[in-house]
C-alpha cells in the first residue's frame, strides 16, 4: 500500500478542518452554552448535535467490535462514498476501478467529482476476477469499489478474490457491505487490522430498518477515518438521527429477529417466484432481495406498476437483460406480488 499521504489529495492533507468552540472546549462539564449563536429556547432541538457522534459511536463499537476511533458516521452511505472521492481523487487526473454491474452511486459520485470511472465486467455467475480488476488499474488509480453482497445481483463476492485485491492493490479498497447482515459470509470488519487499505461501508437503511433517518457507516484505520472526518460538514448527522440510532442499538435483539424473518421470507419468495410462468431464471441471493430473469422485464414492470406494485427494472444495465430486482417484503406483500404475477398474461 502507498502511504496515506501519497493517496490523499495534497490540499486535503494540508487542510485545517473547521472546528467549533465545543470541539475545542476542554473544561468541566458545561451547563451554559453561549458559543454558537443558538436560540436558547425550544430545548432540546435548539442545540447543535454532537459533531463527532461519540455516544452513538461508543454504543456501535460494542456491537461491531471496532474501536470508536475507527468509525465514521455520515448522512447515509452516499456521503461516505462522496467523501472518499473528495479526499483521495484529483479531478481529471486520478481514476477508480469498480465491478460492473454494481451500485450506481459509485459512478454518479465519480462523475460529480470529475474522476475517471473504470468498469470491469463480472462473469456469468456475477463473480469478479482479481487479476482482471488489477489489470484495469494504473499508477493513478486511487480506489477500487467492491460491493458484497453485490447490488443488483444479490450474491456474495468470492472472499479469496477480495483478499487478493486487498493484498496486491496499492490504493484503498472500498468494500460496501450494505447487505452483509443478510449473508452467511462474515464481515470484513474483522480484517481491518490486517489490511490498512481496507474501508468497509455499512448502513442503517437495510437490516436495521432505518432508511428514513439516513445514517451510513464507514470503518477503516484511525488515519483514514481522520481524513474523512477532516472534510465532512461540521454537523453532518442531525440530533434526531443520532437519537433514533441510539434507540435502535438498545434493541439489537429486534434487528436480529427481523433478519431471521426476512431470510425465511426470501427463501419462500424465491421458491414461489421460480414457479411463475414468466420466470426464466432465478439468481442466488445472499441479501434481502433477488435478481430474476423474466420473459419481458419492461412489460412485466409496467404491468406491476398498474397493479400498484413497485419492483426495480434492471433490464438496461450490464448482464441484466430482462431482469427484475425484487425486494423481500412481508408475507402479505410477497403474496400480493405473486398473485399479481400469476394473473399476468404476457
Swiss-Prot record:
Needed cofactors: pyridoxal 5'-phosphate
GO molecular function: histidinol-phosphate transaminase activity; pyridoxal phosphate binding
GO biological process, alphabetically ordered: L-histidine biosynthetic process
Pfam families: Aminotran_1_2
Catalytic EC class: transferase
Keyword match Cytoplasm: no
Family matches, as InterPro entries: Aminotrans_II_pyridoxalP_BS, Aminotransferase_I/II_large, HisP_aminotrans, PyrdxlP-dep_Trfase, PyrdxlP-dep_Trfase_major, PyrdxlP-dep_Trfase_small
Pathway named in the protein's UniProt entry: Amino-acid biosynthesis; L-histidine biosynthesis; L-histidine from 5-phospho-alpha-D-ribose 1-diphosphate: step 7/9
E.C. number(s) listed in UniProt: 2.6.1.9
Residues bearing the modification N6-(pyridoxal phosphate)lysine: 206
Keywords: Amino-acid biosynthesis, Aminotransferase, Histidine biosynthesis, Pyridoxal phosphate, Transferase
Reaction catalyzed: L-histidinol phosphate + 2-oxoglutarate = 3-(imidazol-4-yl)-2-oxopropyl phosphate + L-glutamate
Entry keyword Amino-acid biosynthesis: yes
Domain of life of the native organism: Bacteria
Matching NCBIfam families: hisC
Protein family (similarity comment): Belongs to the class-II pyridoxal-phosphate-dependent aminotransferase family. Histidinol-phosphate aminotransferase subfamily.
Record text on subunit structure and interactions: Homodimer.
HAMAP family: HisC_aminotrans_2
Protein name per its UniProtKB record: Histidinol-phosphate aminotransferase
Species of origin: Bacteroides thetaiotaomicron (strain ATCC 29148 / DSM 2079 / JCM 5827 / CCUG 10774 / NCTC 10582 / VPI-5482 / E50)
